[in-house]
Amino acid sequence: MDPLSLVLQTFGVRADVFFTGNLCNLHDFTEENGQRGHLHILKSGALDLISKSGSRQRVNKPTVIFFPRGEKHRFVPDPLTGADIVCATLEYNELSTNPIAKALPPELVLSMESYPKFPKICDALFDEAFSDEYGRVTAINRWLDLFLIEILRVCLMNKLITTGLMAGLADSKLANAIVAIHTRPAENWTVDTLAAEAFMSRAKFAASFKQVIGQTPASYMLDWRMILARSLLKNGLAVSEVSEAIGYENSSAMARVFKKVLGVSPKQFQLDNM
C-alpha cells in the first residue's frame, strides 16, 4: 500500500458539504479548538478572503480555499456577482494525533489553473453541486473526498508540508521505514533495523527522522502503537489480543505503557469507549 493511502486508511478524514450556491452576503467561518477543517471551492464570481490575521486578498477565478484546522476567516462576496461556491467541513478521526490535520499549513489558497487535475475533478463536483439530482449531497461528499486526496498529493509533491508524518512520507527513504512501522507494528523494531528499511546508515537515519518527523524513531513507534491500541480496543478486541498485535510480550506490559501514556488502563479505556 502506498504511504498516503496508509495514512488515509488509518486516520481518516471525511468531507461534509454544508453550502452550495451563490454566496451573496458577508459570512464568517470558525471552528472551536480546530475540531473541524473548512474546504471551499470557488466556481465563479469573486470574493474577498479575510484571514484570522486580518490580511485580505481578492479571489476572482476558480480557486481552492482550504483551512485544515478551521482557522477563523471571512468571505465578502462581490456585490454585483456574488460567489458561486461549494463549502464543506472536514471531520478528522483521532484529531489530536491526525497527521493530516497537524501537518498541513493553516491556510491554503490554490488556483485551479495551476494544477491540471483540479478542474477534472471539480467539473464533476460542480455538476452535482449545482443540480437537483437525487443523491446529490452524498455524491458531492464523495467527490470532495476525492478532491481532498488530490490536494494532499499536491501538498506532498510541492513540499508544502515540511515536518511531521506527512513530510516523512514525501521522503522516499524515510517512507520505507514509516510504512514498515505502520504495517508491521508487532516487530521488534530498533534504530538499526529501521535504518536498514530506509537504506540509510544508523546515524543518518536517526538524525533525518528526528529532523523531519519531529520525534525519535522510538518515540514515534510508541505513539503509533498506542494509536493502534486505542483503535483495536474501541473495536472490541481483548487486551491480550491488542498487546500481541502491537508487539508487547504480554498484556501486563502493554497495560503499564498504555496507562503511563494515556493515564487510564486499557480496560477502563475500552469501557469508556464502547
Feature annotation, model-predicted:
Residues K259:
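DNA-recognition helix of helix-turn-helix
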Residues V179, T183, N188-T193, M200, ...:
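Terminal helix-turn-helix DNA-binding modules in bacterial transcription factors
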Residues M1-V17, D28-T30, P106-L110, S131:
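A short, N-terminal "cap"/entry segment at the start of jelly-roll beta-barrel domains
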Residues K43, P119-F130, I178, H182-P185, ...:
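Regular secondary-structure segments
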Residues I100-D123:
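Aromatic/histidine-rich interaction motifs
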Residues A15-P106:
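N-terminal regulatory/effector-sensing and dimerization cores
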